[in-house]
Design a protein with these regions (language model features):
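A structural signal for multi-pass alpha-helical bundles of membrane permease subunits
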Residues: 2-276
């Protein structure tokens, strides 16, 4: 019994050590955002600033000079719309692959699922050409259209819908309900946990996406927060206290989302390989 307890204690200490190591950069980032520039690289590190500047760094970052607020709003716009559309599209697709019987349904789904093995980088050139020909290059609509479809979202919601008895849908059909009514009034409410999982994961993926806006946006007025951070680091002249204040501002929505939805993130990761 004692050996088991000692083993658990050692294991717990190791986990806490790993967790603290992973949190150290985040804590340093938050601490640095409240420091004057001359205290940023002091050694040993002062986790609590000796001469705190309060929120002055944040006020400067969010001032009109750097347009940080515009990048923030652009990210919110793209992320929220893309997440909402992906939930709707994935849910409708999953319903079609589970509750509507048609020839070749399962075979087509396997082919569809097999495309997950294709790296997204392979399709960048073709996407670029398509966006240009459609007149959607350098627009938020183009970014949203490219990020609103997800094989993982379809797979996740299909697995959830497979757990819903077909008898519920059949009973609704007998009462005169059509597919849309069955979907929105019966199926959709029953898969809310999976929808929440997809919403949290999709929000994180889109908010952190750097590659897609980098390739398909050239107008600074349309830049998302990730491109804005890169531009800000160049314009601020490597003033690390300001850069860390900007980084904290960019990370804050994800931190809050993780604290509120960590259960759904864990469920999503446990349900299969995560791929955006």
């Amino acid at each position: 019994m004692k050996k088991i307890q000692i083993h658990k204690v050692i294991f717990t200490i190791i986990l806490y050590g790993i967790g603290f190591t992973m949190l150290t950069p985040l804590l340093w980032m938050i601490s640095t955002s409240f420091k004057p520039e001359n205290e940023v690289f002091q050694f040993p590190i002062r986790w609590i600033p000796e001469h705190s500047v309060g929120f002055d760094n944040y006020k400067e970052v969010w001032g009109e000079q750097y347009n940080f607020g515009m990048y923030y709003l652009n990210s919110i716009k793209v992320t929220v719309i893309s997440t909402a559309l992906q939930i709707l599209v994935s849910a409708l697709g999953a319903y079609g692959f589970t509750k509507i019987k048609w020839k070749g349904r399962d075979q087509l789904f396997l082919i569809y699922l097999a495309t997950m093995m294709i790296p997204p980088q392979v399709m960048i050139v073709s996407r670029f050409v398509i966006m240009q020909k459609m007149g959607l290059y350098n627009t938020h609509m183009g970014i949203i259209l490219m990020t609103m479809f997800s094989l993982y979202g379809l797979f996740l919601l299909r697995q959830a819908m497979m757990g819903i008895p077909d008898s519920l849908c059949e009973s609704a059909k007998i009462d005169g309900a059509g597919h849309l009514r069955i979907f929105f009034q019966i199926v959709f409410p029953l898969i809310k946990p999976s929808i929440a999982t997809l919403a949290v994961l999709k929000f994180v993926w889109t908010w952190n996406d750097y590659q897609t806006p980098l390739i398909f946006l050239s107008n600074r007025m349309l830049f998302t927060i990730q491109l804005g951070m890169k531009l800000f680091a160049s314009e601020s002249g490597s003033i690390y206290s300001l850069t860390m204040a900007a980084a904290v501002s960019a990370t804050l929505p994800l931190i809050l989302l993780f604290l509120c939805g960590q259960r759904y993130i864990i469920e999503g990761i446990a349900s299969g390989a995560v791929k955006g």
